[in-house]
């Protein structure tokens, strides 16, 4: 961005609470930096397809609505995460499956392209050992996952194709039922997994890929726990006891997940009502097109967003609500079964933690709550690496 334009746009941001670096004590910041911090659900890859959005450039949440980029990963001490191949659910027809498969492959290629363009600062991780090696090298860690396995159609051999492309985690379903499973936000069709969905579980285990139960119905969750030979995860979910929404999990199932060795990675959505109005969607569409706007259009967008924020914020959830959710999960499941999966760039973020720069606040708060640095390190990344190793060790024994 040229300097005159930067100066022109900087003024509105000087008054923003996001302009200053999050206030965390030097000691807490150092502890956070020394940990391996991984988020299991980064939807920023939705911006990669066109090639016009530069992941290496410093962006601002207030400007384009984005929450993750390489500079902010450094600022927030986020060492890596799962970059998501997301496909919105469509029809269960051969033509729709083909279109979805193409879209998913394009997204996978875009993620690999971005990793390659920034190979001096980040690398593709296929295993837990890869993640630890990249961390030692001072590089950011890029895992790849699939949110919604609808693009597989009825051909489960495509799971191996995506595995070869680097995918190491996948969920069967998203916001609507598909050929594999019932969604938690749809009317039951299969009463859990479909027959093909049960085969999907076996193939995921065979390949050593993590099974992600987020967005799955309660019945699907129960069947995933029953059928999987290794622990499953919820890549971006939360406790229903904190906010009663179908996307969240009840305490009994949280305990069952922990007994099975699984991990719930804590979401920042479904903590409180948020703004899903047409006006908010329109602002979001304009923000996603930030790179193409001229200075006058950018000023107008910032003014319109400020007016809408003053009328109703993008979310009523706060950082304290998020921490209450995480602390409840720890109390129910234990520190070995909780992690971080905030759904950045997929609707995530709360007041006081609007983007990844604020992640050190979590470590600071956990220390204030009396958790040891060892336990915090489990939550920040250790628990993820454990379940990855378990899934891949099972696959290796079966090969």
Q: Each PLM stretch: what is its role?
A:
Residues 1-7:
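Bacterial N-terminal signal peptides that target proteins for export
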Residues 7-17:
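Bacterial N-terminal signal peptides
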Residues 20-191, 244-399:
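N-terminal hydrophobic targeting/anchoring segments and the immediately downstream early-domain regions
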Residues 37-44, 216, 234-237:
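Histidine-centered catalytic micro-motifs
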Residues 190-205, 224-234:
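Alpha-helix-loop-beta-strand connector modules within alpha/beta enzyme cores
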Residues 202-223, 251-259:
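Substrate-binding cleft of carbohydrate-active enzyme catalytic domains
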Residues 218-219, 239-241, 270-273:
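Short, catalytically relevant binding-site loops at active-site mouths
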């Amino acid at each position: 961005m040229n300097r005159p334009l930067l100066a022109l746009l900087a003024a509105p941001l000087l008054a923003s609470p996001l302009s200053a670096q999050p206030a965390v004590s030097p000691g807490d910041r150092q502890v956070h930096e020394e940990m391996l911090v991984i988020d299991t659900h980064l939807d920023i890859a939705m911006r990669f397809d066109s090639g016009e959005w530069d992941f290496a450039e410093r962006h601002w949440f207030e400007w384009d609505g984005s929450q993750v980029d390489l500079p902010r990963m450094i600022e927030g001490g986020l060492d890596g995460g799962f970059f998501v191949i997301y496909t919105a659910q469509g029809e269960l027809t051969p033509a729709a499956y083909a279109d979805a498969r193409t879209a998913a492959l394009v997204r996978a290629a875009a993620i690999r392209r971005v990793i390659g363009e920034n190979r001096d600062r980040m690398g593709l991780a296929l295993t837990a050992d890869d993640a630890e090696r990249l961390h030692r090298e001072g590089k950011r860690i890029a895992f790849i996952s699939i949110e919604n396995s609808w693009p597989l159609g009825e051909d489960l051999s495509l799971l191996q194709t995506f595995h070869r492309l680097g995918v190491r985690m996948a969920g069967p379903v998203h916001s609507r039922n598909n050929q594999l499973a019932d969604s938690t936000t749809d009317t039951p069709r299969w009463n859990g997994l479909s027959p093909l969905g049960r085969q999907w579980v076996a193939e995921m285990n065979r390949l050593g890929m993590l099974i992600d139960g987020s967005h799955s119905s309660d019945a699907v969750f129960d069947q995933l726990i029953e059928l999987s030979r290794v622990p499953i995860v919820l890549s971006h979910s939360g406790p229903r006891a904190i906010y009663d929404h179908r996307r969240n999990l009840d305490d009994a199932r949280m305990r069952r997940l922990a007994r099975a060795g699984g991990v719930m990675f804590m979401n920042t959505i479904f903590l409180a009502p948020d703004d899903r109005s047409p006006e908010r969607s329109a602002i979001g569409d304009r923000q996603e097109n930030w790179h193409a706007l001229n200075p006058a259009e950018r000023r107008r967008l910032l003014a319109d967003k400020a007016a809408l924020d003053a009328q109703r914020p993008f979310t009523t959830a706060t950082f304290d609500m998020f921490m209450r959710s995480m602390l409840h999960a720890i109390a129910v499941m234990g520190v070995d079964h909780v992690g971080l999966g905030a759904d950045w760039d997929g609707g995530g973020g709360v007041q006081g933690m609007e983007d990844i720069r604020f992640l050190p606040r979590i470590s600071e708060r956990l220390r204030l709550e009396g958790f040891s640095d060892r336990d915090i390190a489990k939550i920040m990344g250790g628990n993820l690496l454990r379940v990855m190793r378990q899934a891949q060790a099972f696959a290796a024994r079966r090969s």
